[in-house]
Amino acid sequence: TAQKQGYASLFAQIKKETPLGGDVAQEVLSKLFQRVVGEKVAELGFDMVNGDNRSLEALRGLMEKYNDDFIPNMNIEWEDISIESIMAAVGEEARWKFNIPSVMRKIDGISGGHLIEVGARPNVGKTSFHASLIAGPNGFAHQGANCIILCNEEAGKRVGERYLNAASGMSRYEIGVNFQKASSAYYPVSKNIRIKECQGRDMAWVESVAKSYKPDILVLDMGDKFSAGGNYARPDEALKACAIYARQIAKTYDCAVFYMSQLSAEAEGRTTLNQSMMEGSRTGKAAEADLMLLIGKAPHVEGEEQESPLRHINVVKNKLNGWHGMVNCDLDYLTARYGV
């Protein structure tokens, strides 16, 4: 008969199919069962709307009977916490070494996945700080790191000049006088440095850059000016969202992200700084950082022709090795180099 032929065709087709794995079959059956229970819940709700059922007892009975079927069974791949694995990870924590001796004595270095927040008042030397770390002697670029600098405050060429100063150890005037010397010092590190002026961009664009160019070091100057998108009730919530996004980029694309920030007016002329001085933020930004460095300088002394070159780097958060305190160094503003 036609019905018999139909069954024969169906069974022949089933015979050809590849059987589902045990886990997949279990999941499919579980989903179907949950749908059946959902239909029963909907029927009870419909009866209550129509006044046919005024008690929750039937619904409570369903929940007690089938609750375990809606709690998924997990298959988690737990972290390897053997001593060999832990010590190997510790060895990778400082892949890129700091080139400021006073900092290096306290913090070995950084690695992919780290979010480093750097804060300072205007005219303290934020841009020179990352230029010195990357392009200065024994900096990240010298160590072979692929470095990308995204700047949305200063013009890209001006930021590039700081990198030229730091790499060559020469002022603008000295470079003009001895261009060949500057070029020979700058060329080896410039191959590992890319700078992009990017006003008006958001964190989604930053993530696209990280995905496309795979940097080892990614500098956001200024981090707070890259919008994270969305609507926020308070400015500090928006800044927290930016920091969270930056941290996700660091972890997802295995790069060290330097997140440059302004400090509030409270930090003006101060040498000892703390997390609460981050402009516009409460604790949201600080909570995301692996390392937070706040750069202070003493107020200008009346009658002095030039401000002091001394800079005070406050290590106010440090998940890398736990050391907190202040290290001192000098900034040569002509060569954009931090040193001792």
Name these PLM-found stretches.
Residues 194-252:
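Phosphate-binding/switch loop-helix module in NTP-utilizing enzymes
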Residues 116-118, 148-150, 196, 258, ...:
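Hydrophobic/aromatic beta-strand patches that form the interior of the parallel beta-sheet core
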